[in-house]
Amino acid sequence: IYCQFKADNVNRTGLNSEPIKPYANYFVPNRGYQDTFADWDAKVKGAYPLQAYTPHYMRRAHTCYDNMTWTQEAFRNPVFMNAQDAEERGIEAGDTVVCYNDFGRMLRIAQPLQGMMPGTVGIPHGVRSLFDESDPAGIVDRGGSEQMLSDGQQSNYFPQVDGYNSLLIEIEKYDGEALVEDCDRGPFLAAGIDAEGTP
């Protein structure tokens, strides 16, 4: 339905309890764009100025197939961000970065892009967590799972979905040990399987 004439014709049938409109309703989302600002009217950004979403990625289908060395070699485990946002943070392509908010911290390889909208971040969905607990006060996921950045709050405009596409975060260049390429790290093995002799 893209015009009032069509909406009027559909509404004459009386099939819907609410009238259909030729335009979408707008819901202010939980942790949406407005929440990236400390002061919306003055347009002053807050502590977590970047809005992240979690697209599917060529390397895997959720966590399935993410254990294959060939695809790990072909496709890194990036975080896509706007090139200007990266430059303002001193981040270059290939840098290990920490993505964080009040819920957790995880590491990824930065991939700045000119085509990303400023203030947005793409964190491809579906990696396996690899926790670094060497600092109990600052546990970080070296696997790079986006779930570290969410408390599981459901979307208020589509209640069947967790809010993984409304993550408010900040990204900084990581000053710790750089990430090892996934293909060099070795596969994740099921419990009880010995890594010795595993290709």
Which functions belong to the PLM regions below?
Residues I1-T69:
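Long, low-complexity segments enriched in small/aliphatic residues
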Residues T63-Y65, T69-F80, Q84-P199:
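Long, contiguous, secondary-structure-rich segments that constitute the structural scaffold
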